[in-house]
């Protein structure tokens, strides 16, 4: 499995307990020889011990980025998620074949799958060069589609469109 570099990119804010569970699962994958190139964690304003835990993890395979005071520059949660996720994406090195796996660190992402099943899933992607990302599915429904901004993944920037409309018209919105 060494011909595919896997990057786990996740955002954290006050999610210490689930973050630990997700990191433990990824460490099991590393022990099984899965080609985990890097775990990238972008934290914004945690105050529950998440930052300290992430700092204790820092090594060649774990990149911890602190992006604090984001509420001063962005007006809503989706803009903050988008900004922080883009910071994480910028740290993926495109030198070899890469599989990007975003991890929502505030949920126990791997509680419903065993390491072997996940490894088998990753192996399926090795031979399919048209896939460069694996997105999590969870119940209850949890998916930050509006925060995804990698070119080619989302054709329309709904946040930007809503922002422009709000400048012209007096409208409200559910997400923006």
Predicted segments, located by residue:
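Cell-envelope/extracellular polymer assembly enzymes that use nucleotide-activated donors
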Residues: 5-7
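A conserved acidic beta->alpha catalytic loop
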Residues: 15-16, 42-53, 69, 105-107
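Glycine-rich phosphate-binding loop signature in dinucleotide/nucleotide-binding domains
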Residues: 92-98, 128
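Short, well-formed alpha-helical segments that are part of the catalytic scaffolds
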Residues: 15-30
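Short beta-strand/loop segment that forms part of the nucleotide-sugar
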Residues: 10-11, 35-45, 67
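Short beta-strand-to-loop acidic/aromatic patch adjacent to the donor-nucleotide binding site
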Residues: 96-112
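Conserved donor nucleotide-binding strand/loop of the catalytic core
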Residues: 55-94
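Conserved catalytic core of nucleotide-sugar-dependent glycosyltransferases
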Residues: 107-176
């Amino acid at each position: 499995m060494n011909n595919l570099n896997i990057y786990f990119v996740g955002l954290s804010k006050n999610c210490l307990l689930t973050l630990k569970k997700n990191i433990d699962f990824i460490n099991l994958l590393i022990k099984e020889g899965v080609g985990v190139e890097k775990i990238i964690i972008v934290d914004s304003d945690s105050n529950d011990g998440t930052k300290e835990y992430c700092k204790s993890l820092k090594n060649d395979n774990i990149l911890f980025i602190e992006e604090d005071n984001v509420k001063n520059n962005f007006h809503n949660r989706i803009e903050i998620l988008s900004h922080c996720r883009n910071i994480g994406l910028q740290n993926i090195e495109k030198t070899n074949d890469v599989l990007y796996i975003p991890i929502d660190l505030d949920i126990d992402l791997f509680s419903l799958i065993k390491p072997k099943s996940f490894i088998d899933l990753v192996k399926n992607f090795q031979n399919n060069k048209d896939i460069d990302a694996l997105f999590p599915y969870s119940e209850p429904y949890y998916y930050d589609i509006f925060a995804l901004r990698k070119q080619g993944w989302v054709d329309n920037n709904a946040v930007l469109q809503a922002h422009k409309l709000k400048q012209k018209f007096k409208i409200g919105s559910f997400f923006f």
